[in-house]
Regions:
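N-terminal cationic and glycine-rich segments that engage phosphates or anionic surfaces
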Residues: 1-126, 130-140, 250-251
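Positively charged, low-complexity, intrinsically disordered RNA-binding extensions
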Residues: 140-251
Length: 251
């Protein structure tokens, strides 16, 4: 798991009572509304909607909120029609590659906010294609490792269409093609496994190790500021932070 994924997991676990929860649910709802608007209300034939729903479930968004967002998107919601997906790419401190996915109704505002975050944190916002070649789109499902038989987990994951299972600390990371996200989660849950999270992500082909606290803090400040931007849905980066450094930064 990349350092960004580990950091996101730490914030996820700490975030149940966090003041950002309302903002997070608003972002998740917006993603569901727009996905349903653009691709229809049936997740089976709408990969973007599948991902939006899986991500919302991973953050314990109530089922009724998810259903309400789908209904809004499949109706005549003017807000949904006004939003578009925009991808931004750039470099952070220490040459870390960063991809930002946003849903916006005002490109100029969003670009300004994201550029400000990069500039403030020793980064540079680049042009389209600047860093995307360093990543590949994958589905990632996380399962707590406690009490799990790895061989049985691999079989269940394969039944759902996964092509790799890795143990990372106290969590199994199940990797699959993007279109198999929902089927992998369903297969694991049907086999009795607890799914901690499941979403589409950009997996770095190579990573940059941030081996000291100072370097890690600089990059994480940029990631946090980008994720706190209202229009931003996802941030992906290719850094890796050793466990002991990440624990020190998170404490």
């Amino acid at each position: 798991m990349s350092g960004h994924s580990k950091w996101s997991s730490i914030k996820h676990k700490k975030g149940a009572a966090d003041a950002r929860r309302g903002q997070l649910f608003s972002k998740l709802s917006r993603a569901i509304i727009v996905a349903a608007r653009e691709g229809g209300p049936d997740p089976a034939g709408n990969l973007a909607l599948q991902n939006a729903i899986e991500k919302a479930r991973s953050y314990s968004m109530p089922k009724e909120n998810i259903e309400r967002a789908i209904a809004r998107g499949s109706g005549t919601d003017a807000d949904a029609a006004s939003y578009e997906t925009v991808i931004y790419e750039g470099y952070g401190p220490n040459g870390v590659a960063v991809i930002v996915e946003a849903l916006t109704d005002n490109r100029n505002r969003t670009a300004s906010d994201i550029r400000h975050a990069f500039d403030k944190n020793d980064g540079n916002l680049g042009t389209s294609g600047a860093v995307s070649w360093l990543f590949e789109r994958r589905a990632i499902v996380l399962v707590p490792s406690e009490g799990v038989d790895e061989d049985e987990l691999i079989l269940a994951a394969a039944d759902g269409g996964a092509d790799d299972v890795k143990l990372d600390g106290s969590t199994y990371q199940i990797v699959a093609p993007p279109e198999n996200l929902a089927s992998v989660r369903q297969a694991l849950e049907a086999a009795g496994y607890t799914v901690e999270s499941g979403e589409l992500t950009m997996v770095p082909k190579t990573t940059i190790e941030l081996a000291d606290e100072s370097a890690a803090k600089k990059v994480l400040r940029l990631i946090d500021q980008l994720e706190d931007t209202d229009d931003v849905q996802d941030v992906f980066a290719n850094f890796d932070i050793p466990e002991q450094v990440l624990e020190a930064v998170a404490s």
